[in-house]
Amino acid sequence: METVVIVAIGVLATIFLASFAALVLVCRQRYCRPRDLLQRYDSKPIVDLIGAMETQSEPSELELDDVVITNPHIEAILENEDWIEDASGLMSHCIAILKICHTLTEKLVAMTMGSGAKMKTSASVSDIIVVAKRISPRVDDVVKSMYPPLDPKLLDARTTALLLSVSHLVLVTRNACHLTGGLDWIDQSLSAAEEHLEVLREAALASEPDKGLPGPEGFLQEQSAI
């Protein structure tokens, strides 16, 4: 009889431990996934393009298939449904800016790789490398600022810094690759990002304490003092 009881207790304990382990696994996948993606993003080396440009003597020898200017997990970060549960309404604008910057950067890299023979000098290539190195940390900063508690002013500052870095990459790429006509899509993309950035900027201003005219309570206090 005692053996049966011991076996039954053992079975129940095993079931309990298995259920607990499954619960921990589910909670980990549900709540820790965004940060896991961010950690992967942090651990990914900077762009293969930069390494290739620093080792190749001729830009035209670079292989476009080997170029990854941004982390391959950024798509998973942008498509993560956890961002949807946002009461502030700011996350959609942050996601839009990240997507625009990601797409712009990828296309600029492709244009750079396809214009190797048109490069002015090796100094132009170096300029692109320097500017490209600044983009990944900016993306990292924006993603980190998207986790609660949200700070509209921090979101505004970091998305602005990211957009400035991408705009700088546009300028140096245009100059280095002699890009002229048929590039309206670049200006349109930057304008679209600016519209989203304006929403974040307004939210940042709204989050600041009003230092202007006194409110009704202050006005009544002033009147009573008089």
UniProtKB/Swiss-Prot annotation:
<dbReference type="GO" id="GO:0010955">
    <property type="term" value="P:negative regulation of protein processing"/>
</dbReference>
<feature type="region of interest" description="Disordered">
    <location>
        <begin position="207"/>
        <end position="226"/>
    </location>
</feature>
<dbReference type="GO" id="GO:0031642">
    <property type="term" value="P:negative regulation of myelination"/>
</dbReference>
<feature type="topological domain" description="Extracellular">
    <location>
        <begin position="25"/>
        <end position="226"/>
    </location>
</feature>
<comment type="function">
    <text>Functions as a negative regulator of MYRF in oligodendrocyte differentiation and myelination. Interacts with the C-terminal of MYRF inhibiting MYRF self-cleavage and N-fragment nuclear translocation. The secreted form promotes differentiation of T helper 1 cells (Th1).</text>
</comment>
<comment type="similarity">
    <text>Belongs to the TMEM98 family.</text>
</comment>
<keyword id="KW-1133">Transmembrane helix</keyword>
<dbReference type="GO" id="GO:0005886">
    <property type="term" value="C:plasma membrane"/>
</dbReference>
<dbReference type="GO" id="GO:0005789">
    <property type="term" value="C:endoplasmic reticulum membrane"/>
</dbReference>
<keyword id="KW-0225">Disease variant</keyword>
<keyword id="KW-1003">Cell membrane</keyword>
<keyword id="KW-0472">Membrane</keyword>
<protein>
    <recommendedName>
        <fullName>Transmembrane protein 98</fullName>
    </recommendedName>
</protein>
<dbReference type="GO" id="GO:1900181">
    <property type="term" value="P:negative regulation of protein localization to nucleus"/>
</dbReference>
<dbReference type="GO" id="GO:0005615">
    <property type="term" value="C:extracellular space"/>
</dbReference>
<feature type="transmembrane region" description="Helical">
    <location>
        <begin position="4"/>
        <end position="24"/>
    </location>
</feature>
<dbReference type="GO" id="GO:0045063">
    <property type="term" value="P:T-helper 1 cell differentiation"/>
</dbReference>
<keyword id="KW-0256">Endoplasmic reticulum</keyword>
<feature type="region of interest" description="Required for interaction with MYRF">
    <location>
        <begin position="1"/>
        <end position="88"/>
    </location>
</feature>
<comment type="subunit">
    <text>Interacts (via N-terminal region) with MYRF; the interaction inhibits MYRF self-cleavage.</text>
</comment>
<dbReference type="InterPro" id="IPR029668">
    <property type="entry name" value="TMEM98"/>
</dbReference>
<keyword id="KW-0964">Secreted</keyword>
<keyword id="KW-0812">Transmembrane</keyword>
<dbReference type="GO" id="GO:0005783">
    <property type="term" value="C:endoplasmic reticulum"/>
</dbReference>
<feature type="topological domain" description="Cytoplasmic">
    <location>
        <begin position="1"/>
        <end position="3"/>
    </location>
</feature>
<dbReference type="GO" id="GO:0070062">
    <property type="term" value="C:extracellular exosome"/>
</dbReference>
<dbReference type="GO" id="GO:0048715">
    <property type="term" value="P:negative regulation of oligodendrocyte differentiation"/>
</dbReference>
